[in-house]
């Protein structure tokens, strides 16, 4: 038996529609004490998932809103329990009054993520689907939303479950051979087992290979802005951000630390990192900033080398350019096209050279095109992209264990030795979907949700 929980699913801000979400045994009957149908019939008389008009009352029995509600009976609901939703006008006062009336009717306040936790515990979804709910809420681009929606529908589980189930069958056979040596069981087939485990390892490798693209879709392409002082790095960040994110002055060395800002560039989510201008300096604080600029290149996806095109290249420009070319991808941005250009593009060893004016905004369509070419949309965002670090870690551990099992087979070791590695692989892979559940992991996952989800 589960207790009755309630929450404002849409937050307490003033909105067009506000939703009270309910779940638990007996919640439909209890909700009927607070929401009365216009028909005069009890709320429990409604068929599942059919909206009906009614009135919401506060704890003193006073009407506070004319709204709609629907019910879903177990097990055909989000949580797998009896559930109800009351859809009001988005008045914080009305929603709060309705919630307090529900508490008086025997409900308690839902904890963060409790509706989705109940869905997981009741078998309505696995952990990958639960985590994808958060990703879908947080998605900032169409690609991120599409990938998260695919995972909510079970895309990762559909890849993991066949591998896990195959390992279960192998383990069962190994145990049968070991536990019943006198029975007429098929003999230990080295080549058959090795082929099966090797194939599953390849499938895990393919899934892990999608991590890099998945991270960029979900969290953004990390683009580090490099250049000498006063080349226009901070002005570039402000232009792409659409507001003055950082201070811009004519004084060299104004930016002394890295500054991050997430922006949308066409279909791309981009995490811009503005850095201190690269130059030799005696200022201790600025020197630390320059060192951080050099460090930022090491884990970026692309470096944006910004240079003032109205002046000849300096030694400081060349030092920044060399740092940018250490990145996996690099784009040269010839800034200040509103002035007379003096730099020859042939002097810059970049595949992508974009002339722009951060002052008036010209050339930024070309920068977007460069991102399209560097980061093509060549992988379908259907849920198959692995975006979650926890899941990737568990899959990597599973792959290492199954690879160890293959090596044991090739070395001619006995089935019990192979079983140790294979069962370790199963434990790790089971963590991905929650088959092998660790409470500390699930607590951490659902704590990330807001109340009402």
Where on the chain are the PLM-derived regions?
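Inter-motif core of Ras-like GTPase G domains
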Residues: 286-310
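C-terminal-of-GTPase-core extension/linker across diverse P-loop GTPases
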Residues: 3-8, 12, 142-264, 281-283, ...
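Switch I (G2) and immediately adjacent beta-strands of P-loop GTPase domains
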Residues: 53-64, 69-73, 253-281, 299
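Short alpha-helix of the ABC ATPase nucleotide-binding domain corresponding to the H-loop/switch region
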Residues: 278, 286-290, 318
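Conserved catalytic network of the ASCE P-loop NTPase/AAA+ motor domain
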Residues: 12, 62, 76, 126, ...
């Amino acid at each position: 038996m589960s207790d009755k929980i309630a929450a404002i699913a849409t937050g307490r801000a003033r909105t067009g529609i506000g939703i009270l979400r309910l779940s638990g045994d007996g919640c439909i009957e209890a909700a009927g004490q607070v929401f009365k149908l216009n028909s005069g019939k009890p709320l429990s008389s409604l068929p599942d998932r059919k909206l009906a008009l009614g009135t919401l009352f506060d704890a003193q029995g006073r009407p506070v809103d004319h709204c709609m509600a629907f019910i879903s009976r177990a097990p055909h609901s989000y949580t797998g329990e009896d559930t109800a939703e009351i859809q009001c006008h988005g008045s914080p006062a009305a929603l709060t009054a309705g919630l307090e009336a529900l508490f008086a009717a025997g409900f308690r306040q839902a904890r963060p993520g409790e509706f989705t936790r109940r869905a997981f515990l009741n078998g309505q979804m696995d952990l990958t689907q639960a985590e994808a709910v958060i990703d879908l809420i947080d998605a900032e681009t169409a690609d991120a939303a599409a990938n998260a929606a695919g995972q909510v529908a079970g895309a990762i589980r559909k890849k993991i479950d066949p591998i896990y189930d195959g390992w279960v069958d192998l383990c069962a056979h190994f145990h049968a051979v070991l536990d019943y040596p006198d029975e007429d069981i098929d003999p230990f087939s080295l080549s058959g087992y090795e082929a099966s485990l090797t194939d599953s390892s390849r499938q895990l490798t393919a899934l892990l290979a999608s991590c890099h693209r998945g991270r960029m879709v979900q969290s953004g392409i990390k683009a580090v802005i490099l250049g000498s002082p006063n080349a226009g790095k901070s002005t570039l960040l402000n232009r792409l951000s659409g507001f003055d994110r950082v201070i811009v002055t004519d004084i060299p060395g104004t930016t002394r630390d890295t500054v991050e800002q997430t922006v949308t560039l066409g279909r791309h989510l981009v995490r811009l990192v503005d850095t201190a201008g690269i130059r030799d300096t005696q200022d201790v604080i600025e020197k630390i900033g320059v060192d951080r600029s050099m460090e930022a290149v090491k884990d970026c996806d692309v470096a944006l080398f910004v240079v003032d095109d109205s002046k000849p290249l300096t030694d400081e420009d060349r030092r920044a350019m060399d740092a940018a070319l250490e990145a996996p991808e690099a784009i040269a941005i010839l800034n200040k096209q509103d002035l007379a250009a003096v730099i020859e593009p042939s002097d810059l060893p970049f595949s992508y050279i974009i002339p722009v004016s951060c002052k008036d905004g010209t050339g930024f369509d070309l920068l977007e095109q460069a991102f399209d070419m560097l980061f093509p949309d060549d992988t379908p965002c259907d849920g198959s992209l692995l975006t979650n670090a926890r899941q990737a870690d568990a899959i990597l551990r599973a792959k290492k264990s199954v690879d160890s099992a293959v090596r044991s087979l090739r070395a001619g070791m006995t089935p019990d030795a192979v079983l140790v590695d294979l069962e370790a692989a199963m434990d790790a892979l089971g963590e991905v979907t929650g088959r092998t559940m660790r409470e500390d992991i699930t607590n951490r996952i659902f704590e990330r949700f807001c109340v009402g989800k």
